[in-house]
Design a protein with these regions (language model features):
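C-terminal beta-sandwich/jelly-roll accessory domains of carbohydrate-active enzymes
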Residues: 663-773
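Short beta-strand/loop motif that positions the catalytic acidic residue
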Residues: 588-591
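A domain-start/cap signature at the N-terminus of enzymes
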Residues: 284-468, 744, 751-761
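Short beta-strand element of the alpha/beta-hydrolase
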Residues: 467-478
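Compositionally biased alpha-helical segments
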Residues: 30-317, 748-772
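C-terminal catalytic histidine-bearing segment of alpha/beta-hydrolase fold enzymes
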Residues: 596-704, 711-712
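Primarily recognizes the serine-hydrolase "nucleophile elbow" in alpha/beta-hydrolase
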Residues: 536-583
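Gly/Ser-rich "nucleophile elbow"/oxyanion-hole loop immediately N-terminal to the catalytic nucleophile
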Residues: 461-467, 511-544, 556, 560
């Protein structure tokens, strides 16, 4: 039956689950690709040399084949329900070709008939606006097809971007007597994950067809099973992301009470999860009691336990507010308490105190050493948050004079120990619960610019200063930072991410300027000191003009990021010459097939990155143009969740051609050679007139040596980290094969603390500087 969309819907018979009605499904063949970093892609398998891909009917996801952990043929195969709509065509319908390039794409809201007005600009006349009507001609739970009403326009969109009420309204047009079609609607909702709508549709069917209650009760049970299973997956992810148990438990208990229609097996899984949460809670309560007992016992007999109450309070606060993040530091404490030979409260408290203040690698049962580590932790924490250089100098003197007890006598605090302790430093300020549901505006502290540098920050519900949270920096040059961040906040809150949105205070398009980059860098550094951000899990992201900047910024500052996320960004100016820096920072790039330059510039460039086995993932939306692609955000978070910044590098190769793009793992270009750096206004569109400086370094741990080669650099500062160099042995720094420094490295506590207070990066710390001129 085929009738106009204003009156009726016709169908394309397909089926996903077949839970309660036997119909032969129209199977869609798809493979399942599991990446080594954890994310999963599903689609028809494609292959071009070393580049593999998954096409799901809406988009094509490309990646280097060697980055796959597994490919399961047919494991992603599904049979999706779909509904075809008969939409009108104007009498003057033009059957010409679609535009080959789409720019300036905007769209109005979908109306009740599944249509919307869209506008775009021809690439050769951007001042002109072309308007047409798009109409939905096929609804699917994951993807829906559209065509033009006035002219030929064939495309597809993710169903998730179509308002749910529009789709429900269209499907509600099916006549009440069409039982089988209404059952397919239930399956459609279930496949889309719309459980509320699926349950409402089943209830309506039960009212209209009471004779089929047994079948419909089975259908309802399937819906409850799917909903409860999905909720449990979400709750487990939230717990892992730091959402407190006190938030999850009431939701789980309420759901179990209202999900009486779920099967016994799925309800048992839910009850098992609740039991596990309660058991974990009891275990945590026991640990808190044991921790307090160890602290109290260590002070009996006037034992010199040193600093205690503030650390005990901090540990209890962390274990109560962000247990998933804090608990790993108490593994040595838990293990010691199970010692069959007996337990000493003093040793137990020493282990807890040293692991908390210095990390697992510094855990010790020697209370004197633990107290020294605690003093170093307190000193470094205060210095990291002190804006006064004179105060930091006093803290530096304290660290220099600090002695660590040992079997062969006291010794100074080592650079390695200071590095490990610094990783435990957390912000001092605590956010109240009500601020966790609001967007906060921060002004960069100690900013020397005449115009204050500001940014917006949104923290997840379970945020606490003693935890560590991943962050995404959303860029929107020439636009409102809040508007740019809105699209990211819901998914970020669900997954336990912080969203930062710098106010770039720029007008017009992205300028590729040093000032724009400096604004982002200042905001990141301020946020690292102010908020509990994991510095190894910071990503930069942007769409359209923000995508241009995200691509450019990521390649210009690779050692400060875990990855760059580009939505419809164009690789202009510095990006093509900087492509080699992709080996240091992963990229996730999303483009429309009809975006300007996609087939000529973007796709070929990204393929070269994959061919070199650099970590680049490319998503190409079919028959889509220069758009934001908000529907890709959940996949982006999946991709980002498995990636961390490269900190302990053995070697790197980098290029740079702009003032400000000068820091690479402690090697800082302090002066370019003439002609090797250009201001953005002097750079060609694709950077053909750039001759970037090159910098490469190899950290040879066995020889305690740094081997550097460079071209186009007049002066270089080398900051030394205990991650690459052993400060207890002689060090050799070579440039171009010639030794430029040879001798014992010496810790400069003032430089260490000044750098930490400036950048706020607790994972990349430096203790000595060597200047090469």
């Amino acid at each position: 039956m085929t009738i106009n969309a204003q009156n009726f819907l016709t169908t394309a018979r397909t089926l996903l689950l077949g839970l309660w009605l036997t119909i032969i499904p129209n199977l869609v063949r798809a493979d399942k690709f599991t990446m080594k970093t954890g994310e999963i892609y599903v689609g028809h398998a494609e292959r071009e040399g070393v580049i593999a891909g998954a096409y799901d009917g809406v988009k094509r996801t490309l990646f280097r084949a060697t980055r796959m952990a597994s490919q399961e043929p047919g494991a992603g195969s599904s049979a999706w329900e779909s509904f075809k709509l008969i939409q009108p065509r104007k009498t003057n319908f033009v059957s010409n070709q679609m535009p080959t390039i789409l720019t300036g794409m905007t769209a109005e809201a979908w109306d009740e008939f599944g249509r919307r007005k869209v506008r775009y600009s021809p690439p050769r006349n951007v001042a002109k606006t072309v308007e047409l009507t798009q109409a939905l001609i096929e609804l699917g739970p994951k993807a829906s097809k559209v065509r033009g009403v006035e002219t030929y326009w064939s495309s597809q969109v993710s169903t998730s971007i179509i308002p749910r009420n529009v789709i429900v309204g269209l499907l509600n047009r099916i006549p009440k007597e069409e039982k089988d079609e209404r059952l397919r609607v239930v399956r459609f909702y279930l496949q889309a994950g719309w459980f509320t709508e699926a349950k409402a549709a089943v209830s309506a069917l039960k009212a209209d067809f009471p004779e089929f209650n047994d079948v419909l009760n089975n259908a309802a049970a399937g819906i409850y099973d799917a909903e409860l299973t999905e909720l449990m997956v979400r709750w487990k992810g939230q717990l892992k992301g730091g959402t407190p148990v006190s938030v999850i438990r009431p939701e789980l208990e309420k759901t179990l009470k209202t999900a009486e229609g779920a099967s016994a097996a799925v309800r048992a899984s839910g009850l098992e999860m609740l039991d596990l949460i309660n058991a974990t809670d009891e275990l945590r309560s026991r640990r808190l009691r044991e921790l307090k007992a160890a602290f109290d016992g260590s002070r009996q007999g006037n034992l010199n336990a040193g600093p205690g109450p503030q650390y005990l309070a901090e540990m209890i606060e962390a274990l109560s507010k962000c247990p998933e993040i804090a608990e790993p530091f108490f593994a040595p404490f838990d293990q010691y308490l199970r010692n069959p030979d007996g337990v000493s409260p003093k040793k137990a408290w020493s282990i807890a105190l040293s692991a908390w203040s210095g990390g697992l690698g510094l855990a010790t049962d020697d209370i004197s050493v633990a107290l020294a580590y605690a003093e170093a932790y307190e000193t470094i924490t205060k210095a990291a948050h002190s804006p006064d250089q004179a105060d930091r100098s006093k803290f530096a003197n304290r660290l220099e004079s600090l002695q660590i007890p040992g079997p062969e006598g006291d010794r100074p605090l080592s650079a390695h120990e200071a590095q490990t302790i610094t990783e435990r430093v957390r912000p001092l300020n605590t956010l109240s619960d009500d601020t966790k549901n609001r967007t906060l505006t921060y002004r960069v502290e100690n900013d020397t610019n005449s115009t204050p540098t500001e940014y917006l920050a949104t923290v997840p519900p379970g945020y606490h200063r003693l935890g560590q949270w991943p962050a995404i920096i959303v860029l929107n040059p020439g636009g409102d930072p809040d508007k740019a961040a809105v699209a990211w906040r819901r998914e970020a809150a669900e997954r336990g991410w912080i969203v930062l949105a710098p106010d770039l205070k720029s007008t017009g398009p992205y300028h590729f300027s040093t000032d724009e980059h400096a604004t982002v860098t200042l905001c990141l550094r301020d946020a690292l000191k102010r908020l509990a951000i994991n510095p190894d899990r910071v990503f930069v992201a942007g769409g359209l003009g923000g995508g241009d900047m995200a691509w450019d910024y990521a390649l210009a500052h690779p050692d400060s990021l875990a990855g760059g996320i580009v939505l419809s960004g164009l690789p202009a100016k510095y990006v093509p010459p900087y492509r080699a820096n992709t080996q240091m920072v992963p990229l996730f790039i999303v483009e429309g097939e009809l975006a300007p330059g996609e087939p000529q510039v973007v796709m070929p460039l990204v393929k070269t990155l994959m061919q070199k086995n650099w970590d680049a993932t490319y998503v190409q939306y079919q028959k889509r143009g220069y758009e934001f692609f908000e529907e890709e955000i959940p996949t982006i978070f999946d991709w980002a969740s498995g990636r961390r910044r490269k900190v302990d590098v053995d070697e790197f190769q980098a290029v740079a051609a702009r003032e400000g793009d000068q820091r690479f793992y402690g090697l800082i270009i302090s002066e370019f050679a003439t002609g090797r750096s250009l201001a953005p206004e002097s750079v060609n569109t694709l950077g053909e007139n750039l001759k970037p400086a090159t910098l490469a370094a190899k950290f040879a741990g066995t020889a305690n040596q740094i081997q550097i080669t460079s071209d186009g650099i007049k002066a270089l500062d080398i900051w030394i980290s205990p991650r690459q160099i052993d400060f207890t042995k002689r060090m050799d720094i070579k440039l171009g094969g010639r030794s430029r420094f040879k001798g014992m490295p010496k810790v400069d506590w003032n430089s260490f603390l000044d750098d930490l207070a400036s950048r706020g990066d607790t994972r990349q710390t430096y203790f000595m500087k060597v200047e090469i001129r």
